[in-house]
């Protein structure tokens, strides 16, 4: 009996640690075009200009700078090889329901309280960022990023998950 108790407590502990993990919220991202491709070299410099119109509390610009430094780029205040312009548009909560029915009666006698069929409900957060990267050696490239959670959760955890998706996407634009 003690093995079952041990295994059960292990799974409960694993579940609790997953629930407190900030990246546990499932999310995905899409770009408005094919993306940005920047051939860069180690020790090149970057500057981030961050605009937060929604007045959202965020550390997106600092976390992005840290990730870029970990890639081997260096942050400067002036005369940078890459100027990254970020405009954080907003973070919104979306909720809607849609009736799904298997009844043929639905098509000729619409009754929203009909018991046949099911309701599909979706709840999620989105975060939109407009991005432009200016380079000394190449043309400027721009895109819009829209990150979306798979479901609702704690707002702070959802925001952190969306920001991580956006940061990882921006970092993926740089290749060495």
Spans of model-derived segments:
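C-terminal partner/receptor-binding element of secreted or periplasmic proteins
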Residues: 149-176
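A structural "domain/chain start" motif
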Residues: 16-73, 91, 175-176
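Surface-exposed short loop/turn segments
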Residues: 82-152
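Second-shell loop/turn segments in exported
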Residues: 48-55, 117, 148-157
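Solvent-exposed loop and beta-edge segments used for protein-protein assembly and interaction
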Residues: 40-42, 78, 123-125
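Short acidic low-complexity segments
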Residues: 71-83
């Amino acid at each position: 009996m003690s093995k079952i108790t041990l295994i059960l407590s292990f799974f409960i502990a694993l579940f609790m640690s997953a629930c407190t993990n900030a990246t546990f919220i499932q999310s995905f991202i899409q770009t408005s075009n094919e993306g940005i491709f920047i051939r860069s070299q180690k020790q090149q410099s970057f500057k981030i200009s961050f605009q937060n119109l929604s007045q959202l509390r965020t550390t997106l610009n600092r976390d992005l700078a840290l990730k870029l430094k970990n890639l081997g780029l260096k942050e400067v205040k002036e005369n940078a090889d890459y100027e990254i312009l970020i405009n954080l548009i907003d973070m919104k909560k979306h909720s809607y329901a849609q009736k799904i029915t298997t009844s043929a009666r639905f098509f000729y006698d619409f009754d929203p309280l009909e018991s046949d069929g099911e309701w599909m409900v979706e709840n999620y957060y989105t975060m939109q960022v407009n991005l432009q990267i200016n380079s000394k050696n190449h043309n400027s490239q721009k895109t819009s990023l829209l990150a979306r959670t798979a479901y609702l959760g704690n707002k702070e955890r959802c925001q952190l998950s969306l920001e991580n998706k956006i940061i990882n996407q921006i970092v993926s634009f740089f290749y060495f």
